[in-house]
Amino acid sequence: MSLLTEVETYVLSIIPSGPLKAEIAQRLEDVFAGKNTDLEALMEWLKTRPILSPLTKGILGFVFTLTVPSERGLQRRRFVQNALNGNGDPNNMDRAVKLYRKLKREITFHGAKEIALSYSAGALASCMGLIYNRMGAVTTEVAFGLVCATCEQIADSQHRSHRQMVITTNPLIRHENRMVLASTTAKAMEQMAGSSEQAAEAMEVASQARQMVQAMRAIGTHPSSSAGLKSDLLENLQAYQKRMGVQMQRFK
């Protein structure tokens, strides 16, 4: 796996699924391929994205700044600086300085990542802030190692939280989660169907599914009534793909 592929993987792992994630993935691909060289426009686009947490925006801004060639005097962006200040906690800053001293002696991506993984996400973000504000200088490989370690820490906590929701025995939470997943799947079906004539059936199925979820929420239904909703939708989507000559069995 190449270095940039690894960085893209880690960064995307902390972004919630949805159309915005697909858009960010495309921007990262373009940046890493050298196709997007306007850092100013890229940062302005990032700043105005909804949903993303300030820290996620800070990490993406840091990655874009590391990758896109820019003029020496280009101003640092406040939204990135604020996100990478470790919540203003002096303990985070102290640890960040210690980490930075270790990273300065490191030259490899994996070496930097290993060192960084023993620190908290707050200290890692503060260390990124030091480098972003030009208060510290490390090689690009080492900076990317720091980015990936930070993303791994965040993804771990997101995974624990997600697992708690998945294994919860509360029927109301499970019911709502199934309806949310069904609704999201329906939206994805509508996007994939596009505007071809054959797409009418897939669009109809997706539209009916979304209406059903809205009705279930409006009238209040038994928690077991949502069981299988998402699976039914995916079966319809795969049947549609088969007719279109596309064989993809990886949605479940």
Curated annotation (Swiss-Prot):
Q: Which GO terms describe its cellular component?
A: host cell nucleus; membrane; virion membrane
Q: Tell me the GO molecular function terms.
A: RNA binding; structural constituent of virion
Segments carrying the region annotation (Membrane-binding) are: 1-164
**Position of the signal peptide:** none
On subunit structure and binding partners, the annotation says: Homodimer and homomultimer. Interacts with NEP. Binds ribonucleocapsid by both interacting with genomic RNA and NP protein. May interact with HA and NA. Cannot bind NP without genomic RNA.
Concerning its family, UniProt says: Belongs to the influenza viruses Matrix protein M1 family.
Q: What is this protein called?
A: Matrix protein 1
Query: What organism is the protein native to?
Result: Influenza A virus (strain A/Leningrad/134/1957 H2N2)
